[in-house]
Structure formats: structure tokens, C-alpha cells
């Protein structure tokens, strides 16, 4: 039995480096203010230093997305994520909400909005499918940086 599988497939899009550069140069620097506001509201985190890593830009076609309920720090052996930062890159579609199970809340995508939430099971969520268009989303995760003394 093989322990992996190689798929030969043609993707329906190409990586656009100009878009990646735009995210790096225009969007990511603007996250500091929303992150500061989040840390001010969640006082237990104020004294910690954070590192945001692994920014992913997702193209979610009509009907697509990750519809299963999940949370962001549940993988054994993975870097423990403290909170999630999502930036909605467009809003020219219906549906496509980020839905939170225990909060009984749906966040509709509004272009330019930043959604920050805890990575733990308390904020189990899913991405509902976009209807009538494609959703673009940038996601990054924050981890607590250890003290220099450790």
C-alpha cells in the first residue's frame, strides 16, 4: 500500500505575483492597527509578543470552501496558534460567510475588513460557500514568541 499519491492536474488559475506583492506591500502593514485593537480588548495577551506567519491567499470558487466545522490549533505537533487573522479581499458574491458554531454568528465578507479570532475550539468555525462569484481571502496565524531568556 502506498503512503502517498501524486496527482497530475491542471489548476484553474495561475499564481499572480503582482497580487502577492500587493498583499505583502499594501495589506499586511495595515494589520498592525486591528491587531493592536484586538490585543487591547483581550487583556491577557497584552504582555506577549507575537509572530504572524504563513500568510495564505485563498481563491474559493462558487460552491467551494471548507464547510466542515473546525478550529485552527487542533493538530498535534503543529505550532500552537493563538489567534487567526483573516482579510477579506473582495465582496462581489453572495454567501461565503465565516460562521462560528458556539457564537451562533456569521461574518459576511466586506472587502478590506479584518476578522481576528481565537484559534482554539471555543471559536469552531467553517467557511460557507460563496454563491454567484469567487471569494478571495488572506489568512495568517499568530503565535506567541518565547522570551529571549528561554
Please place each PLM-identified region on the residue numbering.
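Fe(II)/2-oxoglutarate oxygenase catalytic core
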Residues: 1-114, 122-150
Amino acid at each position: 500500500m502506498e503512503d502517498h499519491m501524486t496527482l497530475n492536474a491542471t489548476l484553474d488559475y495561475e499564481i499572480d505575483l503582482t497580487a502577492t506583492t500587493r498583499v505583502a506591500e499594501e495589506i499586511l502593514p495595515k494589520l498592525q492597527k486591528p491587531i493592536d485593537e484586538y490585543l487591547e480588548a483581550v487583556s491577557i495577551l497584552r504582555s506577549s509578543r507575537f509572530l504572524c506567519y504563513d500568510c495564505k491567499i485563498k481563491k474559493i470558487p462558487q460552491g467551494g470552501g471548507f464547510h466542515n466545522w473546525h478550529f485552527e490549533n487542533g493538530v498535534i505537533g503543529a505550532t500552537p496558534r493563538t489567534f487567526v487573522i483573516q482579510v477579506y479581499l473582495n465582496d462581489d458574491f453572495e454567501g461565503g460567510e465565516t460562521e462560528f458554531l458556539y457564537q451562533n454568528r456569521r461574518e459576511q465578507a466586506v472587502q478590506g475588513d479584518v476578522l481576528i479570532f481565537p484559534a482554539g475550539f471555543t471559536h469552531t468555525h467553517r467557511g460557507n460557500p460563496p454563491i454567484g462569484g469567487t471569494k478571495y481571502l488572506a489568512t495568517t496565524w499568530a503565535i506567541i514568541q518565547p522570551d529571549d531568556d528561554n
